[in-house]
Amino acid sequence: MPDDEEKLQLLADVERLKKILRQKDEMLEEMEDDLKNQGKPCSSKLSLEERAQELSEQLRDLHVEMDGKNATILDRDALIDSLRSEIDKLEKINKEFANGSVIPEHDDSNSFGESEMLRISEDCQKYKETATALYERNAELEKEAVNLKDEIESMMDHIRDLKNHMETRDEEIARLEGELFDERNSHEGKLAARGNSMFSEVIDAERKVEEDLKVLHGENRALKGMVKRLRMEVEEVEERLRSSTKRFNVTRMTTSDIDVKEMRRLRDRVCHLETERVHLWERMFIKMRSIPKREVGALITGYFKSFELSIASVKGGFDGLMKDNEKYVTIIRGLQQEVENLKADIVQLQFDNKCAHRKAAPVVNKDFEHPLLAAPLKTLNNGRPSFFIKPKNVEPMPQLGHSLSSIAVTPQKPAAKFTTRSSIKDDTSEWAERRMKAQAEKKLATPTPRYNYIKLSEPVPKFKPAVLQMPSTSETKEN
């Protein structure tokens, strides 16, 4: 029956070790994925490539060190379990001795052994609490690593979207440049045929458009160069990823072989410790029967001192594990800082992309505007809109062809004062010409926001257009 229990215990230990190995494999795969994802968004600078190589080397060293620490932890766990079981058995034996025999009160060795047992039990409890805290901390670090992995994957998706967006924008810019060139060549003959009065304005507009096109062409070349560099970096990262994947497969095969050897070594170690424990108990019972009862406490105290030394060595191992955990925490914080830097680079790329589109949009819109609409506005110097200049004593009154709400008014020069009867006819003809000009401008194009125009609601019965009081020249200057 004890053999069956020992077999079950060994099977449970083997399952636990397999579970730990699976967890380590998963952690290794996650760290490899993190390294792969962190290598993709690197810029063209050599410092980032060197940093990626250093991180990969550090990660490889950490894997090797982690495997060694895992083996040490397993050895220490087995040793702690064996020591705890022996301590429990010794406590049971001590209780049996205390119940079966009467020890005099003046026996100092017995009191010393009890105090040592209490102190050692307290130390064991502290070590248990420390181990529990370490396990919890390791679980938190694993969760944090998983969160960082998800965040890096989302960032890589966002970078891929930005890259596709930049490519589409480059194609759109190239298409708009071609359309702009064709439109400029098609309108060149029309603008030249309008006469020498607009020739200077056309030359200025053409010069401005050419300057803007030069700027856009330079920006387009810079963006194309950036896209080319990014593609080369992506290809280089993919090549490094393939090589690292091959190395990882070889490393995984070697580590699996090492894990099998480690399991065999642990199994042999467990058998050796079991035989050692049996021989120890046999020697202890022989000595307890051969020596008087007063010396039993000193014997137990000696065994406890040896246990204390072994536990002190285990404590030193735990201190080393704590230092390793602190080192891993600093490494994770460094990776978080690198993630923040990558986010800042993404925001900067978005801002540069928006600036390029904003620079390209005004030039394209400006070239397609009508030449008459692009003329500068004239300032109003105590003038009135021509629409509200009412002729005096003219029969019959001209009828409006449409409602007042649909007429767009453009600023004109101030009207001259009426001095004679002949000036009334001239003013009437000017008013009719201005009205026809306003209707023609409305048919040509919809008024843009850069022109001043007045819109009225539906005409009221018996409506009389009022004369607007425009500010004087001195008031406009003061404002």
Swiss-Prot record:
Null allele phenotype: Recessive embryonic lethality. Hemizygous mutants are viable and survive through embryogenesis, but are either lethal at the larval stage of development or sterile. The oocytes of sterile mutants have extra chromosomes and prematurely exit the prophase stage of meiosis which results in endomitosis. RNAi-mediated knockdown results in embryonic lethality.
Subcellular location: Chromosome, Centromere, Kinetochore; Cytoplasm, Cytoskeleton, Spindle pole; Cytoplasm, Cytoskeleton
Coiled coil residues, start to end: 4-180, 210-250, 321-357
Principal subcellular localization: nucleus
Top-level taxonomic group: Eukaryota
Entry GO terms, CC: cytoplasm; kinetochore; microtubule; spindle pole
GO term, biological process aspect, one: positive regulation of protein localization to kinetochore
Entry keywords, A to Z: Cell cycle, Cell division, Centromere, Chromosome, Chromosome partition, Coiled coil, Cytoplasm, Cytoskeleton, Kinetochore, Mitosis
Record function comment: Transient kinetochore component required for chromosome and spindle pole alignment and chromosome segregation during mitosis. Functions downstream of the RZZ complex to mediate kinetochore-microtubule attachments and nuclear envelope breakdown during cell division. Required for kinetochore assembly and localizes the checkpoint proteins mdf-1 and mdf-2, dynein and dynactin to unattached kinetochores.
Record's subunit section: Interacts with Zwilch homolog zwl-1, a component of the RZZ complex. Interacts with mdf-1 and mdf-2.
The name this protein goes by in its record: Spindly-like protein spdl-1
Source organism per UniProt: Caenorhabditis elegans
Gene: spdl-1
